[in-house]
Amino acid sequence: MKFAVMGRMGAEEAIGPTVVAGISNADPCGGRSRRKSSRRAGGRIACAICWAMLPLAASAELSNDSLLGPGLRYRPAYDGSSSQRVELVPVIRYFGETWFIRSTQGVLETGVRTELAPGLHAGAQLAYEPGRKSSESAFLRSHQIAEIPGGASAGLQLEWDHTVGPVPITLLARVRKNIDSERGAQADLRLSVGVFHGGPVSAGIFGQATWADEKSTTSLYGIAPQQSAVTGLPAFQPGGGLLFSSVGLLWSVDLNPKWVVVGSLESRRLSGNVADSPLVERRSNGYLSAGIAYHY
């Protein structure tokens, strides 16, 4: 399940006070002109504002804090559909010594992982792979397109967590092979960066690219000759390659030390010849999700 959420940011931990002190206790200007002093003070204020905007700790994609709660997601019936739906989704993340489960990196997945070096983890996962319901799309119903049932995938991943100054960064590479051999395999590359922290409010941005082999694209967007005869749509055979790219915003608001409201906004665009499939009504789709989670 696609659900990128934000977790709790850390306490103030002196960034604000330290920077402010740096401004208010600036060295005397001595014999320098007022203009130079003004420029220097302005530069210090600008730096202070920039540093104050940076997060002190990681968001849900950028930390390992445990989360559990319900959420709602507004999504297309499938990528490329003009129909939108609302569904209930989990907000979950837990990391044990080796075992983990989470919904905060684009899919609902569980598995094991090990630390290869500080901040670098390798692992294996089982993930939920959503299907495609004709009942959710007027276009699919009108053309008698068969449903694709939800399923599962197995794969490997490599994740790097790092900080540049106070900025948390997570880079995730993941390969997913569907348990149903006819649905092929996909690979994800996802980058998440924390960009804002002010009081109880935190925010981050992310970008993702997903590639798919020919089996995967054909199962999702292909039209076989026999299907063409039934649906009235032209036969279409997509190849493998970049499936979609997306960018998004992550946010969270701490209600208290134990409860947090989380959410995300994502714009996703189909790529390659998949975007030319007769099943694609529009190349770009939006996702909106929000939920409430308990820190445990």
Question: Language-model segments: what does each one mean?
Answer:
Residues 54-59:
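N-terminal signal peptide c-region/cleavage motif recognized by signal peptidases
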Residues 60-108, 215:
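Short glycine/proline- and aromatic-enriched beta-strand/turn motifs that initiate or cap beta-hairpins
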Residues 62-68, 86-88, 97-99, 116-122, ...:
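Outer-envelope beta-barrel architecture signal
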Residues 68-74, 103-105, 124-128, 171-177, ...:
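Transmembrane beta-barrel strands of outer-membrane/channel proteins
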Residues 72-75, 106, 137-141, 172-174, ...:
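Extracytoplasmic loops and strand-loop junctions of Gram-negative outer membrane beta-barrel proteins
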Residues 77-84, 101-104, 116, 148-151, ...:
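Solvent-exposed loop/turn segments connecting transmembrane beta-strands
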Residues 89-93, 191, 283-296:
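Outer-membrane beta-barrel "beta-signal"
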Residues 98, 160-162, 177-260, 264, ...:
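Outer-membrane beta-barrel transmembrane domain signature
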